[in-house]
């Protein structure tokens, strides 16, 4: 394991403790095992995109809160792999009412990536550059070809997969309203 896992684990533990949430309660809320969450906090488990989004959603924070120190440049972020998607954080934009995270996505064919609900009010905006993507709410995904854009409320379970045998490339803009 490199320092990235330890850094993510430390930030995760600080956030959980600051909110007064037990390890068991957060694991239950995120839909992951207590041992998995404990391993993340200790920096002994390699976090996947699915797990990080599940925990971030349960805590009501953007993904960047877990993967970047406050004030750090997105250039310091690394690729975060998931079942089908590898995401790279390109930029974070802060406004008084929301945080915007811009990610580059590579989606491998033949696999469906399931993403847990984000915090209430989170929206995702995806633009496809190569390949064809099926993404959006798990019960009604949308399809986009190169040059097309799709958006959806991401506070419900959602999915990402390719249509056809080719890898897809896209950018994803996630808008997370500030939690009061």
Regions found by a protein language model. Give the residues of each.
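A short, N-terminal "cap"/entry segment at the start of jelly-roll beta-barrel domains
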Residues: 49-99
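A short glycine-rich, His/Asp/Glu-containing loop-to-beta-strand
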Residues: 80-117, 123, 172-178
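Glycine- and acidic-residue-biased ligand/ion/polar-headgroup-sensing regions
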Residues: 121-137
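Ligand-binding loop in jelly-roll beta-barrel domains
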Residues: 85, 154-180
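Short basic helix-loop element that most often maps to the first helix and adjoining turn
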Residues: 10-27
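Short acidic-glycine-tyrosine-enriched beta hairpin
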Residues: 138-155
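Recognition helix of helix-turn-helix/homeodomain-like DNA-binding domains
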Residues: 32-45
């Amino acid at each position: 394991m490199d320092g990235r896992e330890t850094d993510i684990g430390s930030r995760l533990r600080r956030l959980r403790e600051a909110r007064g949430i037990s390890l068991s309660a957060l694991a239950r809320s995120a839909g992951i095992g207590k041992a998995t969450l404990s391993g993340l906090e200790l920096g002994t488990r390699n976090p996947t995109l699915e797990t990080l989004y599940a925990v971030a959603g349960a805590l009501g924070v953007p993904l960047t809160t877990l993967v970047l120190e406050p004030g750090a440049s997105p250039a310091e972020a690394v690729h975060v792999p998931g079942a089908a998607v590898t995401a790279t954080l390109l930029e974070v934009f802060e406004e008084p009412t929301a945080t915007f995270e811009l990610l580059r996505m590579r989606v491998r064919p033949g696999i469906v990536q399931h993403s847990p609900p984000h915090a209430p009010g989170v929206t995702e905006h995806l633009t496809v550059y190569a390949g064809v993507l099926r993404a959006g709410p798990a019960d009604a995904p949308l399809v986009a070809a190169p040059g097309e854009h799709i958006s959806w409320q991401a506070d419900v379970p959602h999915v990402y997969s390719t249509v056809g045998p080719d890898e897809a490339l896209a950018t994803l803009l996630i808008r997370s309203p500030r939690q009061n």
